[in-house]
Amino acid sequence: MKINSTRSVRAWLVAAIASLALAACATGPTVRTDYDPTANFAQYRTWGWYSPIAMEQSGYSSWISERIKANVQREMEARGYRFDAKSPDLKVNFQAAVQERSSVYSMPRSDIAWAYSYRARSYVAVPVWYDEAVVNNYTEGTLTIDLVDAAKNRLVWTGDAIGRIGSRRTPEERAVDIDQSVAGIFAKYPYQAGSGQPLPIPR
């Protein structure tokens, strides 16, 4: 029981920490998408949940996963997809992950060097300019939403919301982060239910 409990807590923390990152920047998270070019999106009219949801593999849900579900449902219904728990055309899965990263950049610095001047017959101060390498370590969080062809159990579309984990945020702030991240991912999804013609995606 102790091992299972530890894994469950760890899984919940991964989800919670990842949600902190998704609106850390003023411009919101970076969104990346990919899709199966052979998929016929015109055949998809209904949707349901993949089982088990990747974020809920610990055996229970959290307020974070429930919040994501509510947002996904709103986005799918807004595109005309009808929920079908028994036999959907598309199954939706989602997960969160964190990763330690680092970035290196140059910072201009100045210092004073002393050089002997034969004209002044003394040592004089000489300014010296140089670039100093600065390493910035940070934690990156990712929320991934997958759309899976239910008949083939094949991934046909995926979207990632990626951002840095910032300072400690309240549950209310994290809820807003989740809303914005899911909306940002689906803003890049170009299809409506029953249509294989992609709509223009805002840049």
Residue ranges and their predicted role:
Residues 10, 60-61, 138, 170:
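A generic structural signal for short
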Residues 21-24:
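C-terminal motif of bacterial Sec signal peptides marking the signal peptidase cleavage site
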Residues 2-14:
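Bacterial N-terminal signal peptides that target proteins for export
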Residues 48-105:
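N-terminal segment of the mature soluble domain
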Residues 30, 79, 94-154, 199:
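Surface-exposed short loop/turn segments
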Residues 26-38, 132-203:
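C-terminal/domain-edge helix-coil "capping" segments
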Residues 41-45, 83-88, 147-154:
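A short, structured loop/turn motif at beta-sheet edges
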